[in-house]
Amino acid sequence: MRHGHGLRKLNRTSSHRLAMLQNMMNSLIEHEVIKTTVPKAKELRRVIEPMITLAKKPTVANKRLAFDRLRDRDSVVKLFGELGPRFAARPGGYTRILKMGFRVGDNAPMALVELVDRPEIKEEAAEQGAAE
């Protein structure tokens, strides 16, 4: 019996689905905000939250587990060097999903996935431009 197993299938094979989620995790860690469909965003949240929790304790074993799941050295470095300490006091809920309406081509519901305490770059750039 299949009592509530695993992730949504998202109309993909298991290898494609895992690779897609891995790429989305790397993109979210690198850019701290990505645009995707709502079902993909909800699945991304389920896999990225434990990764950030793992990064709060920077042991060698945790870094190896993170590299095993991400397969990107730069993402692991940023995860443990920047995101882990940033979310050290937060007991979960590291991501925010904002619904953005529907995609033009196929009317798919779109969402913005972002890390909650990310620094605002646009405001800093506007202040620097005004100061000059």
From Swiss-Prot:
Sorted UniProt keywords: Ribonucleoprotein, Ribosomal protein
GO cellular component: cytosolic large ribosomal subunit
InterPro entries found in the cross-reference section: Ribosomal_bL17, Ribosomal_bL17_CS, Ribosomal_bL17_sf
Transmembrane annotation, as ranges: none
Molecular functions (GO terms): structural constituent of ribosome
The keyword Ion transport appears for this protein: no
Quaternary data: Part of the 50S ribosomal subunit. Contacts protein L32.
SUPFAM superfamilies to which the protein is assigned, alphabetical: Prokaryotic ribosomal protein L17
Similarity remark: Belongs to the bacterial ribosomal protein bL17 family.
Organism, as annotated: Variovorax paradoxus (strain S110)
One of the protein's GO biological processes: translation
Stated name of the protein: Large ribosomal subunit protein bL17
